[in-house]
Structures are given as C-alpha cells and as structure tokens.
Amino acid sequence: MKKTTSQNGFTLIELIIVMVILGIMAAVAVPRYLDSIENAEESTENAVISSIRSGLKQAANDSLYTHGRASWPTNPFEVFVAGQEPAGYTTDNSLANDDGEWTFFAVGNVTKISHQRNDNRRFTWTYTKAVSYTHLTLPTILLV
C-alpha cells in the first residue's frame, strides 16, 4: 500500500503577504481612529460650552423674572443642576491637569474654564461675567 502524506498549512510566502496586507490596513486605520477620538473630544467640548451658554441665558432669565434684574453666576458651572456637571468637573480652582478634567478658576480678574483632553492637551476659555442684560454685555465664553 502506498502511504500518502498530506501537508496542511500556509507557505512562508502566503504568511508574509498576509502580514504585509495587515500592516497596510493598520497604517490606514490607526490615524483614522486617532482622528475620530480627537473629533469626539472636540465635539464634547463644544457641547459642554454650548450647555453653559444656554444655562447662562436661562440663569439670567430666571434672575430677571425673580428679582427684576438679570444676573449671572460667578462660576459658569453653577448653571448645571447639582450632579449634572460634565464628567470630570472639579472645583479645585486650578488649571485642568488630569485627562478629561474640567475646571473653573480665577487668576486675578480673569476667570477661565479649562479642559484637558486625553492626549494631555489643555484648552481654556475666558469667561467674562456680564453686568447687565443688553446685546453688548452678555456673558462671553471665548476659546483662548
């Protein structure tokens, strides 16, 4: 009887080709993944700042209705219901220094909102509390 042997498996060339294809796919996918993370963090920042702006308008309207005069909080994060602040918000009155951290702090007469992204980049916004409710003196939040 003739003995037959079957060899199952991949040749070295086939394995190398698969590795090259996987390398090309990874080279394309990783930068896109990192860009999507950055875009998500930027969108989160925009959403938080928009929420603060909306809350400041509502706080002014509530104050106007209750006291007859519009006023705004010194800390813009006070517009959030307790426990509803953005994830990572701390009240340590310093520049954000942890990933995902949001802070509000004052340096002299300048008040700022800061956020540190997961890649350790920090972004700050200057918050200027308004004095009266006219089109010229609304509170401003500007990216620095």
Where are each of the predicted segments found?
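N-terminal leader/signal peptides at the extreme start of proteins
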Residues: 1-10
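Conserved small/polar residues in nucleotide/adenosyl-binding loops
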Residues: 134-140
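Alpha-helical hydrophobic helix detector
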Residues: 16-32
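Extracellular/periplasmic head regions of type IV pilus-like filament subunits
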Residues: 61-121
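Membrane-proximal N-terminal amphipathic helix
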Residues: 38-66
